[in-house]
Regions:
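Conserved glycine-rich cofactor-binding loop
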Residues: 55-56
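Conserved glycine-rich Rossmann-like NAD(P)H-binding loop of the short-chain dehydrogenase/reductase
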Residues: 71-86
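N-terminal secretory signal peptides
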Residues: 1-14, 132
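Active-site helix of classical SDR
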Residues: 163, 197
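Substrate-binding pocket helix/loop in short-chain dehydrogenase/reductase
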Residues: 139-140, 144-149, 240, 244
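Alpha-helical segment proximal to the catalytic Tyr-Lys
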Residues: 168-169, 210-211, 272
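Short, small/polar-rich loop/turn modules that mediate ligand/substrate recognition or access, typified
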Residues: 213, 218, 274-276
Length: 286
């Protein structure tokens, strides 16, 4: 179906496709124990989001916010299974729909499985937020090969794995968001390799937006500033953290919910015209 097809014909074809897809996955939904409420998503009556690295921090806030926005959500973790289950429980308690899956994004097979789980649970995916990442800090002179290689494996290769599957799976009209960082502009000492791994997200988003032309999928990078998460605060004293907070015009760190609010807007119908961009949400620190 081309973009200039008759709208009625387009909708009829989409509806037929959706019904066929729903019938095809019904046995899988029963086999995996997905509730009837969750199965409703497979008929196209609900949007579906997959958020990597969403057992805590920004990812958890994004998963919960998108669930409040009406998305069925796949929560992802690497090791924090209890935290991922808790995020799902919170979403379900609030009346939302969610599943969780353990997957290391640096493993292409694990990422494919993550998308397969989402397809089986909800019948497809409309939004992918590539959030999973790690941070290793050291001056160039003392950065170890092991720390550098692991950070590149997760942040650069891992995000590539996620975005590759997103390009294959996200339905037309969807959203793809890769998490960058405002450290690409701050360029602070000890952050060099980490900043480079985050700059890659901006290139990914800009190029992918062009590659997916004609499908009405918007692809952007989100670059948070200083956020009150363990990723940022671990290894820092209270005085150091307060010093960073005072560098922002608002004199505070962002909370994960601040970033989730911006991502929510990008994922809404109002965010479609923002495409191929890097969105800085840093409270004005740069």
């Amino acid at each position: 179906v081309t973009c200039d097809s008759n709208p009625t014909q387009f909708n009829d074809k989409i509806n037929r496709r959706t019904l066929i897809a729903a019938a095809a996955i019904a046995p899988a939904l029963i086999a995996t124990g997905v509730s009837g409420a969750n199965a409703q998503a497979a008929t196209g009556t609900a949007k579906v989001a997959l958020v990597t690295g969403s057992s805590r921090g920004i990812g958890a806030a994004v998963a919960k916010r998108l669930a409040r926005d009406g998305f069925s959500v796949t929560v992802n973790c690497v090791v924090n299974r209890d935290l991922a289950a808790a995020v799902v429980a919170e979403i379900e308690t609030a009346g939302g729909k969610a599943v969780w899956e353990q997957a290391d994004v640096s493993d292409p097979a694990a990422v494919r499985r993550l998308f397969d789980v989402t397809d089986r649970a909800f019948g497809g995916v409309d939004v992918v937020v590539s959030n999973a990442g790690i941070m290793r800090l050291a001056p160039f002179a003392t950065m170890s090969d092991e720390d550098f290689d692991r950070m590149i494996a997760v942040n650069v290769k891992g995000s590539f794995n996620v975005l590759r599957e997103a390009a294959r799976h996200v339905r037309d009209g969807g959203r793809i968001i890769a998490l960058s960082s405002s450290i690409t502009q701050l360029r602070s000492p000890t952050y060099g390799p980490y900043a480079a791994s985050k700059a890659a997200q901006e290139m990914y988003a800009n190029v992918m937006a062009k590659e997916l032309q004609g499908r009405m999928i918007s692809v952007n990078a989100m670059a948070p500033g200083l956020v009150n998460t363990t990723l940022f605060t671990d290894g820092k004293t209270t005085e150091q953290i307060e010093g960073f907070a005072q560098r922002t015009p608002h004199k505070r760190l962002a909370e994960p919910s601040d970033i989730a609010d911006v991502i929510s807007t990008l994922c809404s119908s109002d965010g479609g015209w923002v495409n191929g961009q890097t969105i800085f949400a840093n409270g004005g620190i740069v």
